[in-house]
């Protein structure tokens, strides 16, 4: 796994919840050796916390990418709050796709549901460090999202003044552990947004054991 210098580490708090950002993904330049890590003690409790964390993590491509599993988990707990988080985090053209896929994967019931083979309420945990189908997708704590650079270099958007960056989030929930996520940064926004992320929303391997949920 990637090694990070202490100088690359930023920690911040929301109440008693801790968030740590590490890594060197840059909007203005591509590096095939770039790596990132976001570690957090809890999933944000509500929209206010999610928005506050986004104001910090959203300044970097990897911080933004790591917030997608958080938004998915919030949506699983509360559709209304989760949708608000997704609309904040995702680029407008991506919002309806994400919501449609999540409704499909989580089913109609909010909160904690058992696995029926198709509906996978544990999907947000499939990209957290330590979570595997074999251990019921129960990740190590504090929760960690690990990321590496995609083989695809940054691309400038043709229609808008912006740039799309490609990142792999690592997850043991699929045969292909590198889950591609596209991050966009426009010239009119200080924060990045998620441009495309179907690889995080596709069927993962069937769970073995019991998922205990996330804090």
Where are these predicted regions, by residue range?
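Core segments of small alpha/beta cavity-forming domains
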Residues: 15-127
């Amino acid at each position: 796994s990637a090694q990070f210098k202490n100088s690359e580490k930023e920690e911040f708090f929301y109440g008693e919840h801790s968030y740590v950002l590490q890594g060197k993904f840059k909007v203005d330049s591509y590096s095939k050796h770039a790596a990132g890590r976001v570690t957090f003690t809890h999933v944000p409790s509500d929209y206010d916390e999610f928005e506050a964390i986004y104001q910090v993590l959203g300044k970097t491509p990897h911080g933004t990418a790591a917030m997608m599993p958080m938004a998915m988990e919030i949506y699983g707990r509360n559709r209304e709050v989760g949708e608000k988080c997704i609309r904040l985090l995702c680029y407008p053209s991506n919002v309806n796709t994400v919501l449609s896929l999540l409704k499909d994967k989580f089913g109609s019931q909010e909160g904690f549901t058992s696995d029926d083979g198709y509906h996978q309420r544990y999907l947000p945990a499939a990209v957290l460090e330590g979570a595997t189908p074999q251990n019921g997708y129960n990740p190590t704590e504090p929760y960690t999202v690990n990321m590496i650079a995609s083989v695809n270099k940054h691309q400038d958007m043709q229609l808008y003044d912006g740039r799309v960056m490609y990142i792999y989030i690592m997850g043991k929930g699929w045969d292909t552990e590198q889950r591609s996520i596209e991050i966009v940064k426009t010239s009119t926004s200080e924060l990045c947004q998620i441009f495309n992320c179907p690889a995080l929303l596709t069927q993962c391997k069937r769970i073995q054991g019991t998922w205990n949920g996330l804090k």
